[in-house]
């Protein structure tokens, strides 16, 4: 590869990005805000490794993630290694194999980057930034409600624009399918129609199947079972099988607890949601921001996952896609997370010791500070530095001028006053 003739984009693999300060500071801000909320709810941070043995990792992956796992040979062990496409299976492995003495439930949080193979023409990101939580050891609806309430609080703390959490329950669909004699192809066809909420195609498919009118009515109702809380009452009048009835009872209890959290105003229900059928075991949910087509967070209950690592324990969790948050909240983050420094201290080289001393003091006051030596920078140069305040030390080494590039206001002060922290910056 002759890098001399390559554009900056062509120098890195497709599906990954360089993040320059203007966006890197926003990603860091999102991470900090999320982990502040995670910590407030009592979740402890863990850091999984960047690599896993493929045969170990695959035990905890759903079918959709098997095909997008990046793998390669390990020259040391001769085993196949993999870059994890999701962090939750790693958390399950760590809990099951490393945390035998830990009390239950365990509340764990994480931030990391995962890699997923995508088709070249799809144009999707192969590298995904995740921040999430897992609660392991609580089988009750209160744990599911805690996940949803915390996800809502995270979005609120980020000052996200209009947002909703869409809640599903995979056991409801499994109950509808239970007792039907369908081959794998028929199941896939039905699920595709449900995925696209294509009622007419679903009805046409029903006419080809040998099922009762009651079973057909249950299936045909699925695309319409989305909306507010009234969906539960509607569904209760449609389904007759016990498995689906239990799923509805579970959802009633989750929503009752969300009301206690005062977190029920921004939720919707979708009982035709089939995401992660081979992975999730109960309540599932997705977070959406108005005007952005992809989910910014995904979560749900996965009671069978830790058993794949030798320790069956009920669990639930969710993860935010940080890049989806970045792209969907760009305007809001522009104000909340700006690159640059708080203060630029400028002086002649004759007064470098004063500039260094002043910068040191200001950093102790939790300011970000850069020093510069030479003539006072002009407006164009200040914009390049992205500084909030310019402190220009005069030639006498004592008087200073404070200038705000944003407000264009100028103030006079002294080095002594700044060193004594008596000037509001």
For every predicted segment, state its role.
Residues 60-64, 179-180, 283, 383-387:
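Short low-complexity, flexible loop/linker segments enriched in glycine and/or proline
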Residues 125-131, 167-175:
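Short, conserved phosphate-binding/catalytic loop or strand-edge motifs used
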Residues 2, 29-41, 52-53, 88-101, ...:
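Positively charged, Gly/Ser-enriched RNA/tRNA-binding surfaces
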């Amino acid at each position: 590869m002759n890098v001399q003739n390559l554009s900056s984009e062509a120098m890195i693999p497709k599906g990954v990005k360089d993040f320059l300060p203007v966006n890197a500071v926003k990603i860091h801000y999102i991470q900090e805000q999320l982990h502040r909320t995670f910590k407030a709810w009592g979740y402890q941070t863990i850091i999984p490794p960047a690599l896993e043995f493929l045969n170990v990792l695959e035990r905890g992956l759903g079918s959709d993630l098997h095909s997008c796992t990046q793998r390669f040979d390990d020259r040391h062990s001769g085993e196949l290694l993999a870059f994890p496409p999701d962090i939750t299976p790693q958390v399950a492995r760590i809990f099951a194999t490393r945390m035998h003495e830990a009390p239950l439930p365990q509340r764990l949080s994480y931030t990391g980057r995962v890699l997923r193979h995508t088709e070249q023409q799809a144009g999707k990101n192969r590298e995904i930034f995740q921040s999430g939580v897992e609660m392991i050891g609580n089988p009750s609806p209160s744990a599911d409600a805690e996940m949803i309430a915390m996800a809502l609080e995270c979005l609120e703390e980020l000052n996200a624009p209009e947002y909703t959490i869409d809640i599903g329950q995979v056991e409801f669909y499994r109950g509808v399918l239970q007792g039907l004699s369908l081959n794998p192809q028929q199941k896939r066809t039905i699920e595709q129609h449900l995925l696209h909420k294509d009622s007419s195609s679903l009805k046409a498919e029903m006419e080809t199947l040998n099922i009762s009118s009651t079973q057909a009515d249950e299936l045909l109702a699925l695309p319409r079972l989305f909306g507010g809380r009234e969906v539960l009452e509607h569904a209760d009048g449609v389904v007759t099988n016990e498995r689906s009835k239990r799923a509805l009872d579970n959802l009633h209890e989750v929503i009752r607890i969300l009301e206690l959290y005062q977190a029920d105003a921004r939720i919707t229900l979708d009982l035709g949601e089939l995401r992660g059928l081979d992975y999730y075991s109960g309540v599932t949910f997705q977070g959406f921001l108005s005007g952005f087509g992809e989910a910014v967070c995904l979560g749900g209950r996965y009671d069978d996952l830790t058993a794949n690592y030798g320790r069956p324990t009920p669990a639930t969790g969710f993860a935010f896609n940080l890049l989806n948050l970045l792209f969907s909240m760009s305007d809001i983050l522009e104000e909340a997370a700006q690159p640059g420094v708080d203060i630029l201290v400028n002086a002649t080289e004759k007064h470098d010791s004063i500039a260094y001393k002043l910068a040191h003091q200001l950093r102790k006051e939790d300011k970000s500070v850069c020093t510069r030596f030479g003539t006072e920078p002009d407006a164009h140069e200040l914009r390049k530095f992205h500084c909030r305040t310019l402190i220009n030390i005069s030639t006498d080494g004592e008087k200073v001028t404070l200038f705000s590039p944003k407000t264009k206001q100028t103030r006079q002060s002294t080095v002594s006053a700044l060193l004594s922290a008596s000037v509001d910056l």
